[in-house]
Each structure stands twice: as structure tokens, then as C-alpha cells.
Amino acid sequence: PSRDYNTSTFPESDREMGNKSYGLAWDMDTQLAWAKLRTTVGWDHISDYTRHDHDIWYTELSCTYGDISGRCTRGGLGHISQAVDNYTFKTRLDWQKFTVGNVSHQPYFGAEYIYSDAWTERHNQSESYVINAAGKKTNHTIYHKGKGSLGIDNYTLYMADRISWRNVSLMPGVRYDYDNYLSNHNISPRFMTEWDIFADQTSMITAGYNRYYGGNILDMGLRDIRNSWTESVSGNKTLTRYQDLKTPYNDELAMGLQQKIGKNVIARANYVYREAHDQISKSSRTDSATKTTITEYNNDGKTKTHSFNLSFELAEPLHISQVDINPQIVFSYIKSKGNLSLNNGYEESNTGDNRVVYNGNLVSYDSVPVADFNNPLKISLNMDFTHQPSGLVWANTLTWQEARKARIILGKMNAQYISEYSDYKQYVDEKLDSSLTWDTRLSWTPQFLKQQNLTISADILNVLDSKTAVDTTNTGVATYASGRTFWLDVSMKF
């Protein structure tokens, strides 16, 4: 779990947040006379919680806490949790290659079913309000204790065919998706082409266009359940509108080059342009005539992302004694821009505090753009060591990340803090320092159990426990990347 501590204008507002996940999966491959059938059955569990130290969240227009002047917001909204269990069944049939004339075909067909069983719980009653200058409560809202659940069925069918003629391959395909929450029937085109210029795999060009549907529909449904436990004591009503939401999707255009350099070096360059459409966003407004706070979900969100990747690796590993060494170096750059707002938090409260200071300007909370998650430049060095006699593999990744921007909350001691706006929460876009991390993985496939395909793996992420913080020391809030993390994995194929 992690913990957020209060800031100068949000006293007594500490909270703890935590999450966990685990799951099981079973894969079965069946070789038929004319095709290969793969079946997967799985289950995974994901849960998270937010536990505030207090059950009352209120804003004072004239703060009575300590020596704070002007507005301050105090307290919390109690204990809220949510979880989802996903039950998965997947099957895919890969046909053996066959030839019609001078053209070969290798089609495949697949189907998937995922049932998501989710619940959310408010463990205790909490409330929020505003104390105006006269000392009276306004915008008083009670969040009742409750527990609710939501089940969503997701169905998928897909098919594609790899068509090859001489040194050119095409792969047209199509995918159908449906879920019973938004009840949208979505059809996605898929296409990929590959040209082996000299028909010897030394120089290759690839290009493709794909559409992918999906979005965080489940979280929106759980939010709606929690909103149903909300009661306005002040007489204000709440209303949520969905307006026949569409399913968010991404259009992706990709191009790639592969060139063999000398006898044993392969260079690859890839570019991907991804455009997100119909992303779900929300906005809130108050109808003064009916005293109704209206939250509208819509498909106004959109994002454009450019990804570049350049890599060098060996076609055949280096052999030293009984150890195979596979080095690889990867340069990547990602630039993304979108219009989704900051207002996508875990939970809302009706304190009337709907304006913030963003980069020195007083603006509506809904109008603040999403934080810039660009990764300007990343360089990764991968080095794998394989000892064939024992079945041991030691994989390592050393990654350098260029300095990038992040969004922080300003404290009063920060030079960028504007005292004129001391009544409001203040955000600023700052720079994160460059970082260097090392991830390692040790896996063992016992040779005496080779037929059982047993593999035991241990991962250590961020071995050096590197801490990457906001490079402004007097913000009052420090943001760090994940610390050292351990994983243990045991798998068996039969």
C-alpha cells in the first residue's frame, strides 16, 4: 500500500491506498491432423482500496485550522474498496498451410469469452459539505454505507488468413466484439503486409493497419453504483447521464524495416501512429434552477500517439563455453497528446471546490488537461545468458529514461505557489529527473523434467531500488517510481 499525506491547504486529509492481484491459467494444445487447437481457461483477481483517516470531508471558506488563512479542505471520505474477478475461456484453431495455385494460405479462427464479476463497497457512512462565511453548512451530501455488484459478459470472434505469393505476404483479418453493458456491436478490420525484398530475410518491409476496441467500462459502472448511495441533505439533486455511449477504440498504423548487417547483426526500425477515438470522459455542471448537479459521460476524449523504435540484436547468440549470450539494444521514443481532463479521480465529493490553479491560472477542474505521459527517449540494453546443460536462463534489462514531465501539487513553500490563490489547490507541470533501472530474471527448466515442461522463474524489478523523484525539492509532495519488486512464477505445460 501507499499513503498520501496532507498538504498546507488540505490538513487532516491523510489516506492509504493499496491493491493486489493474482490468478491462474491453464493452456492446452491439441495437434489435429489438419490444424492445431489451443484452448486457454483462466481466472484472475484484481482489487484496490482507499482508506481515509476521517469520514467527513468538508471545505471551510474561512479556515479555522491552525494559521491557515482563507479556504481549506479537511478530512476524508472513509473506506472505499472495489474488486473484479475475470473468468476467461479462449480457443484458437490454426490451420495447416495449404496451396491454391501459386498462392499459399494459412488461416486461423478464434473465439473468446470473458465474464467480469465486480463489486464495490463503501464500508462506512461518510459525508461532505461546505461551511460558508456565515458558518452554515451548504452542499451537504451523505454517502451511505453499501455494497453493490456488476457482471459484464464479453464475447469475441476473429479470423485471419496469411496469404503468401513469392516473397510477399498479406494477412487480412476481422474481429467482432460485444459486451452486454454498453451493448455495442463492434467490428474491427485487421491488415498486415510483409515484403521480403531479396527473398532471403536479409531486408524486409512490413506495414499494417489495425483497429482495437476497448475501454475502462467496468470502472464507470462501479462509479455509478456508488453514486446511487449518495443523498443530498441540502436539497441538491444528482443526475448521471450516459447518452448511449460508444465503445472507445484505437486506430493503429504501423511500418517497419528489418535489415541484416554483416553476417550476424539484425537491425529493426519501427514506427506506430495510434489515434484513440471516442474515449470516455466526463463533465459536471449544476443547474441552478433545479438545484441538480449533472454528471455527463460522453465520448469526447481523443489521443494521438507517435512511437518510434530502433533495435540491434544478433541473429545467432555468442557461444562461450557452454553459455549462449544474447545481447540487444533498443532505442525508443513516445510522444502522446490528448484532451482528457484531470477529473478522473477515484471518487468525487460535493464540496463545491471545483476550481484549481493550473500552471499559474485559475481554471475549472474539468478543463485541466491530462498529465503529459510522454517518454522522450528510452534506451534499453538486454543481455540474456543461457546455460543449455542445466536449463538455466539469466535475463537482464538495463534501462535509461530521459528526463520527462510530471504533474505535482504545490505547497506554500514552493516558489511557484501563488498566495493570491491560497484558497485553491494548485497544480504545476514539473520535470522528472532521468533514471537508470535494472531488472533481472532467473528461470530454470530442469532437464530431468524436460517432458513435463516445468519452469521456475524469479524476477527482481528495479534491482538497484532506484528512486526517481520530482526534481523540485520544496514542493511538499514527492513522486517516486516503483521501488524494488519481487515476483515468483511456476509454470508447467502438458
What do these predicted ranges mean?
Residues Q31-K36, Q96-Q106, N167, I197-M204, ...:
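Short loop/turn motifs that connect adjacent beta-strands in outer-membrane beta-barrel proteins
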Residues T39-H45, F109-Y115, P172-Y176, T193, ...:
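Transmembrane beta-barrel strands of outer-membrane/channel proteins
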Residues S2-D14, R51-H79, Q125-K145, G221-R241, ...:
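Solvent-exposed loop segments that connect transmembrane elements
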Residues S164-S169, Y271-S281, D287-L410:
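Gram-negative outer-membrane beta-barrel transporters
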Residues Y5-L182, S307-P317, S321-V330:
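Face-selective signature of the C-terminal outer-membrane beta-barrel domain
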Residues K20-W26, D85-T91, D153-M159, I187-F191, ...:
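Hydrophobic, lipid-facing positions within transmembrane beta-strands of outer-membrane proteins
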Residues F198-P248, Y273-T295, L461, S466-T473:
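Surface-exposed extracellular loop regions of Gram-negative outer-membrane beta-barrel proteins
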Residues S390-G391, T399-I418, D433-T437, S443-F494:
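C-terminal beta-signal and adjacent terminal beta-strands/loops
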